[in-house]
């Protein structure tokens, strides 16, 4: 974020949804907030009480009449003086209000995520809470919302702060042994106890990282790929799952040349289903590209649905891939004698078997995600720093032939890596990346 250090500026932005709307909310934060009130409203409302006022330009023209709320520092979202103006959500009204605010000295439009970045800078939240808020805003399913809310509630911060304090305490014991080994009030040797404590902490962090894999699936979604020969009914199945006509259905083989993807919400879990080009030998350059893309997507899938027309000659061939594969017999309404080959039999013409397949997909997704714990790493950034923490802990535990000073330094580095997750230690270079994920006005 450019010039983020200029906290002397007062920032403003539309923080509500797309215009036009019933109500539009403009948020303001910074040292000029009271001046904005004096200029636009000719009054400063009572803190944290809604006031109905007329908003005016500097020459006195009325812009709109609406509610406003004033949140004095430090008891506000950003920790600065903040205000909200609730206007009618017409495009002209909002544009005029933003233009008037932009003309005031010391005021400028906020950059993406700048309100939240100021909240972080003023100690109102840590980085994990900020990331949780970003995920909460982006959440599209109930499962994603619950996961984001766990993070935004501070569960991660509590856990990482506890682990960091344990490392600091362990290091203090080692340094006490180094500095006061000759003193009578220092236990003879605490090293063995410290290494046992660090070993237990290492196992806790490893378990925590493992739980993060399921959280990543919930945050990013599961991927299901539909494959099969041309005219096996792949596009018809995709249209059923999507609840609308996404793919073109034709008797002509090879109609689908590229990947078609729809997003489903199965029990609160995001599931991306991809229709692919029919797998067959072909001389068509375009169709070959589509088949190559299909195979590439299969390699990334969590589940592959391999479809074959039950009414024709049976020639079930499943390509070797790591993902779980279900054999699906299609066009069940036309008959077929090899029913024992298929995990499910479906007909998009009659609807036979489709609900059972959908239920099975939801059960698969729920089993894959499992039970998400209260505090889990939700970003690759978290996992990388947790692995770095483990690496330093292992060096400290296994460094029997090293001086205690060096092992204490490993413990200091481990606690520093944990501090970088929450933003307590040396994170300036990643702030732009994190806060750029927010929309303007948040």
Curated annotation (Swiss-Prot):
One Pfam family recorded for the sequence: MMR_HSR1
Single GO MF annotation: metal ion binding
Cofactor binding note: Binds 1 potassium ion per subunit.
Binding site for GTP: 231-236, 250-256, 275-278
Main location: cytoplasm
Key words, A-Z: Cytoplasm, GTP-binding, Hydrolase, Magnesium, Metal-binding, Nucleotide-binding, Potassium, tRNA processing
Subunit comment: Homodimer. Heterotetramer of two MnmE and two MnmG subunits.
Stated family: Belongs to the TRAFAC class TrmE-Era-EngA-EngB-Septin-like GTPase superfamily. TrmE GTPase family.
Cross-referenced PANTHER family: TRNA MODIFICATION GTPASE GTPBP3 (PTHR42714), TRNA MODIFICATION GTPASE GTPBP3, MITOCHONDRIAL (PTHR42714:SF2)
Protein's recorded name: tRNA modification GTPase MnmE
Organism: Brucella melitensis biotype 1 (strain ATCC 23456 / CCUG 17765 / NCTC 10094 / 16M)
Lineage of source species: Bacteria, Pseudomonadati, Pseudomonadota, Alphaproteobacteria, Hyphomicrobiales
């Amino acid at each position: 974020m450019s010039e983020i250090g200029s906290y002397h500026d007062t920032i403003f932005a539309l923080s509500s949804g797309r215009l036009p709307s019933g109500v539009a909310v403009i948020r303001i934060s910074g040292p000029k907030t009271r001046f904005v009130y004096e200029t636009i409203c000719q009054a400063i409302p009572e803190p944290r009480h809604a006031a109905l006022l007329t908003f005016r330009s500097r020459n006195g023209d009325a812009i709109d009449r609406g509610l406003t709320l004033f949140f004095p520092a430090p008891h506000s979202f950003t920790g600065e003086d903040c205000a909200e103006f609730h206007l009618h959500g017409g495009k002209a009204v909002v544009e005029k209000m933003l233009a008037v605010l932009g003309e005031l000295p010391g005021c400028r439009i906020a950059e993406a995520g700048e309100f939240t970045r100021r909240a972080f800078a003023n100690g109102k939240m840590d980085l994990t809470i900020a990331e949780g808020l970003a995920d909460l805003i982006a959440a599209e399913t109930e499962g994603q919302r619950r996961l984001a809310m766990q993070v935004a509630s501070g569960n991660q911060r509590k856990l990482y702060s506890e682990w960091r304090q344990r490392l600091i305490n362990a290091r203090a014991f080692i340094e006490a042994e180094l500095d006061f080994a000759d003193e009578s009030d220092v236990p003879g040797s605490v090293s063995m106890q410290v290494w046992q404590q660090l070993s237990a902490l290492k196992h806790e962090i490893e378990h925590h990282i493992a739980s993060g894999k399921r959280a990543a699936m919930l945050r990013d979604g599961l991927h299901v790929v539909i494959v099969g020969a041309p005219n096996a009914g792949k596009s018809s199945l995709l249209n059923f799952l999507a609840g609308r006509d996404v793919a073109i259905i034709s008797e002509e083989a090879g109609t689908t040349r590229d990947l078609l993807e729809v997003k489903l919400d199965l029990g609160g879990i995001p599931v991306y289903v991809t229709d692919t080009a029919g797998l067959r030998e072909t001389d068509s350059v375009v169709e070959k590209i589509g088949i190559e893309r299909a195979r590439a997507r299969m390699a990334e899938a969590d589940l592959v649905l391999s479809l074959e027309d039950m009414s024709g000659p049976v020639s079930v061939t499943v390509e070797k891939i790591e993902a779980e594969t279900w054999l699906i017999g299609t066009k069940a309404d036309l008959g077929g004698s090899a029913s024992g080959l298929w995990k499910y039999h479906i007909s998009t013409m009659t609807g036979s078997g489709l609900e059972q397949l959908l239920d099975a997909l939801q059960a698969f997704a729920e089993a894959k995600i499992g039970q998400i714990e209260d505090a889990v790493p939700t970003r690759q950034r978290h996992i990388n720093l947790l692995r770095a923490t483990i690496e330093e802990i292992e060096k400290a535990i296994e460094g029997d032939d090293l001086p205690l000073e060096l092992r204490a330094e490993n413990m200091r580095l481990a606690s520093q890596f944990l501090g970088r997750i929450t933003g307590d230690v040396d994170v300036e270079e990643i702030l732009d990346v994190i806060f750029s994920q927010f929309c303007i006005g948040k």
